[in-house]
Amino acid sequence: MPLPVYSSRLIEIELPTTYEIDPQRRLVTSRIWGAVTDIEIHQHNDTLRTDPKFDPTYRQLVDMTGITTIGVSTSMINETSLDQFFSPGTRRAFIATDDAVFGMARMFALRAEGLGQTIQVFRDGELAKEWLGI
């Protein structure tokens, strides 16, 4: 009977989230696209909060216009809204053009506001940038 063959080669999987930290502009720009689930949101937040360049007082711009499928549970929205790592009062703008994505973002923003978060959801990216002052 042949023995199983195992490979030590790593397989890279591109998650549908990225972020960029711009210390000069004091801005975190996050982008979320494709089919998004609890796992991707959790991993994005954990990676961002532990990035040595991250500063919780930086503003955030979240581009959600490329999301095609929402697989994020209500419990994840509740959990992440209570687990804030941006400083209270820091402006965060979410851009969502799809109605379902917009609603999910608003649900998150409303829950997070109770912890002093300042989050606005926009359908227009230029208005979001104007509100952030960028």
Locations of regions flagged by a protein language model:
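Amphipathic, Lys/Arg-enriched alpha-helical "gate/interface" segment within cytosolic domains
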Residues: 2-134
